[in-house]
Amino acid sequence: MKDLPAAMRPREKLLALGPAALADAELLALLLRTGLKGTGVLQLAGQLLAQFGGIGGLLQADPAGLKTVKGLGPAKRSELQAVLELARRAIVSQLAQRPVFDSPQAVRDYLRLQLGRLDHEVFAVLFLDAQHRLIAYEPLFRGTLTQTSVYPREVLKRALALNAAALILAHNHPSGVAEPSRADEFLTQSLKTALALIDVRVLDHFVVGRESVVSFAERGLL
């Protein structure tokens, strides 16, 4: 970056104009600090973003995925993972501090972070209080690439134990396609009926794919 004019260097640009003025690659370059022989740090940052599909994809990157990036040694990987984890925790904090339906995009982002990168199917529940604030996020069931077994009685037990007033269901499709199946619809209705017996509302069911998150409520499937 020394070859760049001072005003174009990410650090100087940030100090002069603020972080919002920097592109994603420039912000990432500040974290990486150095590039490789023949590859500048800005170019390395751009390659990293391209490999993972932008900042959103990078947030979902796991340690094994980061290990495949040439030029990311243990020190850089650990620093990058720390920043990514802080970003994930910020989203969790945002959900915990206010009613989740004040920010449906935050729910989507959170679920994508939790479930979008998994290669196995997981069924999870967000347990909410009467003001629809997050009490707990719990992955309750884990399955194969094609199916997972969900037991309504276990969901009811956790809802009662946590004194939840409402909940949001979520599961991922490791195939990458976030399209609800007939089995997903049947399960949702079964859980909704069972939970109504203990006066707990099902507010939504999200299906998480690699690139998108589908809401049952928005589809009219609740």
Swiss-Prot record:
Domain called MPN: residue spans: 100-222
Keywords linked to the UniProt accession: Hydrolase, Metal-binding, Metalloprotease, Protease, Zinc
Alphabetical list of Pfam families matching this protein: RadC, UPF0758_N
UniProt-listed InterPro entries: MPN (IPR037518), RadC_JAB (IPR025657), RuvA_2-like (IPR010994), UPF0758 (IPR001405), UPF0758_CS (IPR020891), UPF0758_N (IPR046778)
Chain span(s) of sequence motif JAMM motif: 171-184
CDD domains in UniProt: MPN_DUF2466
GO BP, sorted A to Z: proteolysis
UniProt binding sites for Zn(2+): H171, H173, D184
GO MF term set: metal ion binding; metallopeptidase activity
Keyword Lipid biosynthesis: no
Family statement drawn from the similarity comment of this UniProt entry: Belongs to the UPF0758 family.
Name under which the protein is recorded: UPF0758 protein Lcho_0695
Organism field: Leptothrix cholodnii (strain ATCC 51168 / LMG 8142 / SP-6) (Leptothrix discophora (strain SP-6))
